[in-house]
């Protein structure tokens, strides 16, 4: 039976490259001279440091631009963390790199496929959703449906089997 997996996986090598490029640009930009603005990557956490909220937003813009240039969707970053004050006027923000579909989104995909009355089944498997069907055309229609209705996360499809 043909099947595919719906996953949420960023290219971590490109994320690291974007962070490195952002660090270089921050180091050479005139408006950041003498400031403690920087970007660090540890595991799947990107930490932004700056002297003020305004500079932090500039650092975030630089990082987003570099991610976009490296073909990494900025929606992979979970920027819901609040800005923390660290000594004096300095601030930091920790961004998590999303990897794996959370259970809420997986259930949404599963219910979407069931409600569409297509001849495919969706099964949640850890941090991925496997969609199986009798025909390849049904699977392609399911992919189009998922892309159209689940736009808040950058989903990708892999492991397509015939």
Curated annotation (Swiss-Prot):
Alphabetical list of Gene3D superfamilies matching this protein: 3.30.70.860, YajQ-like, domain 2
Keywords of this entry: Nucleotide-binding
GO CC entries: cytosol
InterPro entries from the UniProt entry: DUF520 (IPR007551), UPF0234-like_C (IPR035571), UPF0234_N (IPR035570), YajQ-like_sf (IPR036183)
GO molecular function: nucleotide binding
This protein's record includes keyword rRNA processing: no
Coiled-coil zones: none
Top-level taxon in the UniProt lineage: Bacteria
Keyword Endoplasmic reticulum belongs to the record: no
Role summary: Nucleotide-binding protein.
Family under the similarity heading: Belongs to the YajQ family.
Protein name in UniProt: Nucleotide-binding protein Mpe_A3039
Upper classification of the organism: Bacteria, Pseudomonadati, Pseudomonadota, Betaproteobacteria, Burkholderiales
């Amino acid at each position: 039976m043909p099947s595919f997996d719906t996953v949420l996986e960023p290219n971590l090598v490109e994320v690291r490259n974007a962070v490195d490029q952002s660090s270089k640009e921050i180091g050479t930009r005139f408006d950041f001279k003498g400031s403690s603005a920087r970007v660090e990557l540890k595991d799947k956490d990107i930490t932004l440091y700056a002297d003020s909220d305004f500079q932090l937003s500039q650092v975030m813009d630089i990082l987003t631009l570099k991610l976009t240039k490296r073909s990494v969707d900025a929606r992979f970053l979970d920027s819901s963390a609040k800005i923390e004050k660290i000594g004096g006027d300095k601030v930091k923000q920790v961004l998590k790199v999303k990897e794996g579909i959370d259970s809420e989104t997986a259930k949404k995909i599963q219910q979407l496929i069931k409600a569409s009355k297509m001849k495919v089944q969706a099964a949640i498997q850890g941090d991925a959703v496997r969609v199986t069907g009798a025909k390849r055309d049904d699977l392609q229609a399911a992919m189009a449906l998922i892309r159209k209705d689940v736009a808040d996360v950058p989903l990708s499809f892999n492991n397509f089997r015939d």
